[in-house]
Amino acid sequence: MMAALGASEVIAQLESAAKVLMAPPSMVNNEQRQHAEHVFLSFRKSKSPFAVCKHILETSKVDYVLFQAATAIMEAVVREWILLEKSSIESLRTFLLTYVLQRPNLQKYVREQILLAVAVIVKRGSLDKSIDCKSIFHEVSQLISSCNPTMQTLACSILTALLIEFSSSSKTSNIGLSMEFHGSCKRVFQDEDLRRIFMLTIEVLQEFSRRENLNAQMSSVFQRYLALANQVLSWNFLPPNLGRHYIAMFESSQNVMLKPTESWRETLLNSRVMELFFTVHRKIREDSDMAQDSLQCLAQLASLHGPIFPDERSQVDYLAHFIEGLLSTINGIEIEDSEAVGISNIISNLITVFPRNILTAIPSDLFSSFVNCLTHLTCSFGRSAALEEVLDKDDMVYMEAYDKLLESWLTLVQDDQHFHKGFFTQHAVQVFNSYIQCHLAAPDGTRNLTANGVASREEEEINEIQEDDRDLFSDQLASVGMLGRIASDHCIPLLTSLLEERVTRLHGQLQRHQQQLLASPGADSIDNKVLDDLYEDIHWLILVTGYLLADDTQGETPLIPSEIMEYSIKQSTEVDINTTLQILGSPGEKASSIPGCNRTDSVIRLVSAVLRASEVESRATRADLTHLLSPQMGKDIVWFLKRWTKTYLLVDEKLYDQISLPFNTAFGADTEGCHWIIGYLLEKVISNLSVWSSEQELANETVQLLVTLVERRERANLVIQCENWWNLAKQFAQRSPPLNFLSSSVQRTLMKALVLGGFAHMDSDTKQQYWTEVLQPLQQRFLNVINQENFQQICQEEEVKQEITATLEALCGIAEATQIDNVAILFNFLMDFLTNCIGLMEVYKNNPETVNLIIEVFVEVAHKQICYLGESKAMNLYEACLTLLQVYSKNNLGRKRIDVTAEEDQYQDLLLIMELLTNLLSKEFIDFSDTDEVFRPHEPGQATNRPVSAADVVLYGVNIVLPLMSQDLLKFPSLCNQYYKLITFICEIFPEKIPLLPEDLFKSLMYSLELGMTSMSSEVSQLCLEALTPLAEQCAKAQDTDSPLLAAMRHFLKLVFDMLVLQKHNTEMTTAAGEAFYTLVCLNQAEYAELVETLLSSQQDPLIYQRLADAFNKLTASSTPPTLDRKQKMSFLKSLEEFMGNVGGLLCVK
C-alpha cells in the first residue's frame, strides 16, 4: 500500500495517523485509533523503506512520525540485511548519527530511538565484521572533549544505546535473532569496545571530580556518566563457549558480580580507578540519586573476581586497598538514608566474594577495624530499621540494609576454619544485645519509641498482625540465632532472665485481674497496654529462643546445633542434674524460687522458661481468663515446642560424637524426663484444641505439634502409653465437641496424627482395639448415613453434608499418613471408601465443594500410595480412578456454565484431575513395589494377568477429560499449563502408545497439540513442540507408511516450517522448534523439499529468490540425507541459527 504512494503522500498519511493517536480519547473513536495504528504497522513492514524514512526524518516536524521512521529503519535493516550492500548500510549508519549530531534539540525519545537504530546496525554488522565501533568511538571522543554539556550528553546517549543493545538478550531490541547470535555479539563487544566505553567514562568522571562547583547542567552530565559507569561495572560478562540453553539462565541472574576477562586487568586493578569512585562518592553523597549510582559502582568493584587477578597476592592488595578506602569514606560520618543499602551491599559483596584466606591475609589491624565497623553499622542500621517500623514507612531502606549485614555475619561466623573459636564472640554479643533491645518495650528496650524516645502510638493488638513475624523476619531471626549460639555464654542466660521475668510479670497481671473479678464481678480495669507490651516482648523472646536452639529442617534429620551441645557439655561439671530436672518438671513454679536454681543446665532452664509461659497460659484458661490471653503467644509457644521436640526430644546418641549428660538425662530415651515432657505436650495439645478451636492458625500449629510427636516411631511408642491419647482418639472418632468445631484442615491433620500413632509399637490386641476405636467409627457412621433408605431425600441437609465433608477430610488425613510400613492396612481401608465416594459424586453433582473434596481424596491416595502398590492393588486403584472420571465426565459434559463461579469450580476440579492423572503416571518411574508381598497377609489373591500400565489409564483419563477442556477453561493459565505438561509428558514417555489410541482420542490429542502450538502462550507452544520430537521419532522407528500419526506429522512439518520461515516468533522457541523441525524433516524429506520448492516458486523478486535458495541449500548442505543422528542434528541446529539470522523476518513483510 505504502509502496504505491510518493514520499509526500506517505508523510501526510503518517502525520494524519499520528494526530489521531495523540488525540485525547474523547476526540477519536476506537475504529479511527485502530486504523491509525494499522497505518504505522503497515509502514514499518513495508519493503526497503530507507529512502522514504530519510525523507521523513529530514522534512517532517511531527515527533511521533520521526520516532516511527527510526523504528522502521531499524526493523528493515535487520530484516533485509542479506539484500543490502555493505556500503548502503554504512551510509545509513552515518546518516543517522549525523542527523542526531546536527539536531541537539530533538525530543529525547526520538533521539534515543535513532541511536538505538544505530546500535542495532552496529550489532548486526559486528558478526560478519562489516561494521565496527572504531569510527563511532572517535566521534564520541571528540564530543566528550568538546567541553560542551549538550554534546557530552549526546555522547553519553550514544554509548548508552550501544551498551543496552549489546548487554543482554533480554534488554536487546526484539529483532528476531537467536540467543546464540546475541551471545556471540556480546562476547565480541565485551572484550574491546566495552573497555573503551569505560575508559571514556572514567575520563569524564575524573574531569568532573576535580571541579569545585558544578552548575545544574554540568551536574546532569556528571550524573549521566556515573550511571553509564554503573552500567559497565554491572555488565554480566559472558563466559566463552556458553551454550544457548545457558545464556538465558546466566543472564537472568539478578545480582551480577563483576567477573571481567583478563584483558581488563590493567584497567580495573589500577588503584587510581578505585580511588576515583570513592572520591566521586564523597563529593556527591548528599545527592540521593547520584549516591545510588556511585555506591552501586563501589559495590560492583567490591565483587571483583575471576581471571582478572593473576595471583592471591594481587587479590589481597586489592581487598586491603578497598577496605582502607571504604573505612576512610564512612568512618566518622553520619550515614544518609540513601546510603544505607549501598554500603551494606558493598560489605556483603566483600564478605561473599573474597575467599576467607584472602580476608585473613590482609593486615590484622585493618581486618579488626573492618569487623568493628561492620558491628557498629549492624547495630546502628538495626535501630534505624526498628524506627522505620514504628513510623510505618513505605520505603524500608534500613530494614533492607540490616538484612544484608545480618546475612554477611552469617557467612562470616559459620567459618571456623580461618577464624579461631571466640574470634567473633564480642561482636556477636553486641549485635545480639542490640537486636533484643530493639524488640523489647521500654524501659529495657526501645520498641515503639520514636527517635526522641517518645512512645509512638497505641500498640496495635498483637493478634492483629497481618503477616506472621516468623515468616516476615525468618532470615533475620536465623542470623541472630546463629550469633546467639556463638556467644551462648552470654545470650542463653540473657534470654532466660528476660523471659522468666516477663512471664512472672504476666502471671502477676493475670492474677491481679482474677482477684479484681472475684472482688467485684463485671468490673474491668486491667491495663491492656501493660499486657500488650508483655505479650509482644514474650513473642520476640520465644522467636529468638526457637531460632537460637534449633534449625529449620526441611526433610533432614534435625540435629542439636554443635555450639549448643558444646556449651551444655562445658557447663555440665557444675550442673546439678536433679535440680535441673526439678525446674524442668515444675512449670507452675518460678525457677528462681527452687533451691539451687543457679546450678541448673542453662539450655534446659531456657526451655523451662517457655514451658512456664505455656503453664501460665493454661492456668489462665482454667481460671476463665481466656479473653485476656494472646492467641499470638499461644501460637509462638506451640511453634517453639514443635521445633524443639523435633530436635531435642528422644535425642539419638548415635548421631553425635559426644552428648551432654543433662540433655540425655532430661530428654533421652527411657528417661523420666522424656515421659513427663511427652505427657505435658499431649496435655497442651488437648487443652489448645479445646480452648482455641476457633483460632484457625493456632489450632493448626497445635495439630502440627501432635504430628511431630507421633511421626517418629520412638516418640509415638511413648505417646500411646498416655491415657490422654486414647481419650483424644475416642473423642475425635465420636465427633464430640469441641473437636467437631475445628476447621476441616485441622481435622484432616488431626486424623493424620491419630493414624500415625496407630502404628506405634503395641501388642496385636491393643492395636486391634485402637483401630476399632479410631477408624471403625468413621466407617460405621459413614455407612449409616449413606445407607439410609431416605438418603437421597436428606443428603442436602446441612447436618448430613457436614458428616460427609468431615469423613472426606478424614480420608485425606488417613492418606497423608501413609508410610511404606502402613500402606497395606491403609490402602485396604481406603479402597472400601473410594467405591462409595464415586456413588457420592452422583448424589452431590450439583455441590461443587463436595465434588472437589471427593476428587481430592483420590488425588491424595494416588499421590501417597501408588508408588508402593503392586500390580493387582494398582489395578484396583486405576479402576476406581477411571470410574470416578467417567462419572465426573457424564455429569459435566455439555453442561452449560451460567456464571463465572461455576466455571471456576470446574477449573478447580479439572486442575485436581490433572494432578490425579500425573500422580498415576508417576507409577511408571517411581515404583517401590517388587510384588504384592506387602499385602498378602491382609488380602490373599493373585494379581491379574492384564498388563495394564499407568500410561493406559492416564490416556484413557485424558480421553474422558479432553471433551471438558473448553477454550474458555484453557484461558486459566495454570490449568492450561498443567494440561499441556501432562500430554507432553505422555508423548515423551510413551510415544509408542499414541498410534494405538482410539481414533477420536488420537484426533483430539493432535488437535490439542496444534492449538497449543499456534494459539497459546510461548511456554505452552514450547511444550507442544517438545512433544513432536518423540512422536516423529516413534514414526521413524515403526516405519509404517500408512499410519494416522505419520499423516499428522506431515501436517506438523508444514506448521513448524511456517512458524520458522514465515512467521515472527519468540526467538526463545527457535531451539524447541528447530529440534522438532529436524526430526520432522528426517521423517518427511520429500514433503520438506516440496515445501521449499513451493515457497521459492512464489517469490517474484529474483534477488530474494536467490538469497532464499542459497540459504535453504546451506541449511541442508550435507551430501548425506538427514538421519536421526545426534551429531547431524546438532550441526543442523547450528545451521538453522545462521539461516534464521539471514532470512528470519525476510518474508514477513507487506
UniProtKB/Swiss-Prot annotation:
Source organism (scientific name): Xenopus laevis
GO biological process: protein export from nucleus
Name of the protein in its database record: Exportin-4
Protein's gene: xpo4
Location(s) in or outside the cell: Cytoplasm; Nucleus
Sample GO molecular function, one term: nuclear export signal receptor activity
Function (record text): Mediates the nuclear export of proteins (cargos) with broad substrate specificity.
InterPro entries the record matches: ARM-like (IPR011989), ARM-type_fold (IPR016024), XPO4/7-like (IPR044189)
Keywords associated with the record: Cytoplasm, Nucleus, Protein transport, Transport
PANTHER family, sorted: EXPORTIN 4,7-RELATED, EXPORTIN-4
GO CC aspect terms: cytoplasm; nuclear pore
Chief localisation class: cytoplasm
Family: Belongs to the exportin family.
Claim: Transport is one of the keywords in the record: yes
Gene3D superfamilies attached to this UniProt entry: Leucine-rich Repeat Variant (1.25.10.10)
Keyword Nucleus in annotation: yes
